[in-house]
């Protein structure tokens, strides 16, 4: 593989992200503040040098809020396929041979061994020609949605410099938005790809649960965990998704569904953006949009049940270690773990029963259609707030009422970027029936052609 191909292929695919990349290179430091620097390591030149064939390198990152470790590449491609030349930021929750899983915790690195094998999803990307350029930061254990990490810093949100990046796929999403990676591989347990994609103006995809292997992924809540990914443009998202997803027969959706009741969970400014996009949908050649009269009275209970199940499982998996290291955790994950340890076995059993019934209701409601709704309840909150405080938590509760619809049934979902009237990123989410992942990809391509994203 010629070294120059590494960037030529990326430039060809990242069509829609070109203007964003230019804006980032022109003014990222001024907009988002000085990145954290190690005084012993000289700053890197702008951009990364071309890859030296399949040789690997490793260096201490200057932007420690985004990266735990970087390389050029850190892990070279093992094959030459449709992702040749693309750069992957792997969230530091995945096993990468020769590296530790830091999980956003500096203290954890002192206690865990070096991995001897690479996670299945990472290996698949490497096999298809992509190279890993670094392990990206995350909220501690992936148990947070703000992206704030007290040990390493908060990754930049290049599209909204005064706002949070969102988590838990915070570092990988920021790397993609900054243009230092083409693919951000993360985890979407209860919205950890949908939220940063919405906040940073990125495309995101979370597959049907079980469609992509979680082997080598540090679990948080096995009931909900799934690999997921973000990209700056639709062409790259489609290429990555087609690589990772299993082959299935494809067919069109019967219709598209939307609900004023569900949409109204979003705040007014975001709701206007959603309505404008749906108006454009109605006049396009996309699947017919049907408005449904939906009772949303159960959404708070469903969302709370998701949080309780996630918390119960997270504490059973990590509580013994976390109990010894609680003061080292960032505010949001620390509060989440403190609350998780109080969830009784009987509560978990009761909430799992509730979610089983909810899943039947959601699956019946969506049927053979695709549900269109806001990805989050608002654009990204300002960076000045406390992510463990009540205001942020109320925002996340509202977002949880939206994200739970796909989470509960393990449904495939895609996040596409829109903008509010004042130019702040905000995402639209499309949720498809279980197993219809590739049909959702086809609809995404049609969505771009129909002008709904303009």
Feature annotation, model-predicted:
Residues 88, 94, 242-312, 324, ...:
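Gly/Ser-rich, acidic/histidine-flanked active-site/gating loops
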Residues 46-47, 91, 349-454:
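Glycine-rich, small-residue loops and helix-cap segments
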Residues 13, 39-54, 58, 183, ...:
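Structural helix-boundary/capping segments
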Residues 9-17:
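N-terminal export leaders
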């Amino acid at each position: 593989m010629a070294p120059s191909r590494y960037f030529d292929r990326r430039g060809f695919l990242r069509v829609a992200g070109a203007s964003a990349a230019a804006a980032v290179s022109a003014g990222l430091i001024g907009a988002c503040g000085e990145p954290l620097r190690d005084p012993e390591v000289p700053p890197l030149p702008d951009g990364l040098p071309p890859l030296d064939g399949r040789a690997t390198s490793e260096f201490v990152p200057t932007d420690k809020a985004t990266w735990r470790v970087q390389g050029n590449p850190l892990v070279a491609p093992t094959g030459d396929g449709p992702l040749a030349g693309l750069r992957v930021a792997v969230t530091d929750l995945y096993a990468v041979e020769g590296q530790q899983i830091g999980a956003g915790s500096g203290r954890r690195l002192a206690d865990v061994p070096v991995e001897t094998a690479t996670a299945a999803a990472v290996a698949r990307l490497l096999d298809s020609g992509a190279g890993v350029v670094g392990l990206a930061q995350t909220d501690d254990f992936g148990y947070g949605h703000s992206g704030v990490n007290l040990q390493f810093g908060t990754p930049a949100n290049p599209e909204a410099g005064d706002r949070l990046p969102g988590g838990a796929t915070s570092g990988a999403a920021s790397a993609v938005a900054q243009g230092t990676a083409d693919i951000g591989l993360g985890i979407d347990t209860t919205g950890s790809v949908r939220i940063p994609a919405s906040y940073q103006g990125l495309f995101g995809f979370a597959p049907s649960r079980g469609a992509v292997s979680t082997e080598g992924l540090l679990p948080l809540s096995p009931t909900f965990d799934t690999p997921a990914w973000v990209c700056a443009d639709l062409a790259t998202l489609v290429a990555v998704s087609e690589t990772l997803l299993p082959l299935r027969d494809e067919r069109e959706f019967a219709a598209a569904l939307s609900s004023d009741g569900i949409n109204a969970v979003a705040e007014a400014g975001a709701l206007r953006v959603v309505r404008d996009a749906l108006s454009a949908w109605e006049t396009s050649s996309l699947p017919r949009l049907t408005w449904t009269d939906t009772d949303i009275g159960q959404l708070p209970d469903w969302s709370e049940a998701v949080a309780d199940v996630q918390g119960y499982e997270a504490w059973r998996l990590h509580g013994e270690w976390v109990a010894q290291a609680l003061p080292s955790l960032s505010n949001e994950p620390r509060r989440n773990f403190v609350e998780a340890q109080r969830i009784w076995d009987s509560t978990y059993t009761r909430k799992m029963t509730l979610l089983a019934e909810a899943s039947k209701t959601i699956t019946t409601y969506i049927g053979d259609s695709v549900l269109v709704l806001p990805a989050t309840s608002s654009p990204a909150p300002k960076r000045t707030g406390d992510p463990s405080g009540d205001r942020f938590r109320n925002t996340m509760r509202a977002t949880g009422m939206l994200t739970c619809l796909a989470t509960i049934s393990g449904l495939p979902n895609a996040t596409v970027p829109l903008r509010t009237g004042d130019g702040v990123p905000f995402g639209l989410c499309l949720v498809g029936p279980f197993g219809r992942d590739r049909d959702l990809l086809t609809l995404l391509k049609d969505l771009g052609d129909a002008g709904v994203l303009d």
